[in-house]
Amino acid sequence: MDQMDLVDTDKSRKYPAKDLKIILPKTYADVNSKKGPEYWDYENITLKWNVPDSYEIVRKIGRGKFSEVFEGINTVTKDKCVIKILKPVKKKKIKREIKILQNLRGGPNIIKLLDIVKDPQSRTPSLIFEHVNNTDFKTLYPTLSIQDIKYYIYQLLKAMNYCHSQGIMHRDIKPHNVMIDHEKKILRLIDWGLAEFYHPEQEYSVRVATRYYKGPELLVDMRYYDYSLDIWSIGCMLAGIIFKKEPFFYGHDNYDQLVKIAKVLGTEDLHRYFEKYGLKFAPAYQEILGNHSKKPWTKFVHHENQHLVSPEVMDLLDRMLVYDHTKRITPLEAMEHPFFNEIKNNSV
């Protein structure tokens, strides 16, 4: 079944519905219009590539659709680094990632881009990043105390708020892209390859994010989304960690993903969401979806996770995991949530 089978794709029906305005984000809607094209027009930048002579590969540490990632060493300073060797992709995409990393440089908990290099023979481009002594999330998350969880989610929200305040959506928040050095209590948000500048009333690709962390807007082909997509992904992460159920919404494909969400959040609010934005259910959708009532978070509590669950965290999840993207809590609002009181009180 094609993604478009899930929504009415009648070409005569324009989204959004004629009687509905596109609802702009609560905050940071006009950041890029204020900063001007020299800030966001990545297509017209000229990059100055250095030669990779100062870097040596030590070992492979990961791979993605668009790159291979290695631990490396700067042979001059002897410092560890991370070398991201880019696979052949459109120059535009490479320019976008670099421009975004340059714009966010120095922001809280954002991975630092140290250098950009290109091999003179192969012309293969690589990005050089600071090294983080990361523990794999599958090993780390089950060991975290509630204090640890509060601390790291707060640090992630801090990175997210900064990113949004600079007019940028990450669009691929997931455990694999959150590096944690647990010994030093350092968190870094990585992989800005899908990140994009937010411009009001612009259509965006829904082929972003990773299935388990995709917001409902992506699953129903709602292209006028905004920063709030990222808060959904953080909500999925938080639910997964708290309830020890990672990933929390475990869909087998993009269609089943929405079914898994509906089985928790219910179908009533999903229908309201469709109605509000002038979307129509295609007949095939109802066959997959069925009708589900909203489940209380307490349904997911068991003896292995009950020490992590509190009324505060359940309230925060209620505010993050909302179908209607315009009604989700913002990162800044989330940082003020009572769930983080002890973090705020302990921070200088």
From Swiss-Prot:
The active site is at residue 172. It catalyses: L-seryl-[protein] + ATP = O-phospho-L-seryl-[protein] + ADP + H(+); L-threonyl-[protein] + ATP = O-phospho-L-threonyl-[protein] + ADP + H(+). Keywords: ATP-binding, Cytoplasm, Kinase, Nucleotide-binding, Serine/threonine-protein kinase, Transferase. Its EC number is 2.7.11.1. Coiled coil: none annotated. GO terms for molecular function: ATP binding; protein serine kinase activity; protein serine/threonine kinase activity. SUPFAM superfamilies: Protein kinase-like (PK-like). The keyword Nucleotide-binding applies. One of its GO terms (biological process) is regulation of cell cycle. The keyword Nucleotide-binding applies. Residues 55-340 form the Protein kinase domain. Signal peptide: none annotated. ATP binds at residues 61-69, 84. InterPro entries: CK2_alpha, Kinase-like_dom_sf, Prot_kinase_dom, Protein_kinase_ATP_BS, Ser/Thr_kinase_AS. It holds the Pfam family Pkinase. Its main location: cytoplasm. It is found in: Cytoplasm. It is an enzyme of class 2 (transferase). One of its GO terms (cellular component) is cytosol. Belongs to the protein kinase superfamily. Ser/Thr protein kinase family. CK2 subfamily. Casein kinases are operationally defined by their preferential utilization of acidic proteins such as caseins as substrates. The alpha chain contains the catalytic site. Tetramer of two alpha and two beta chains. This is Casein kinase II subunit alpha.
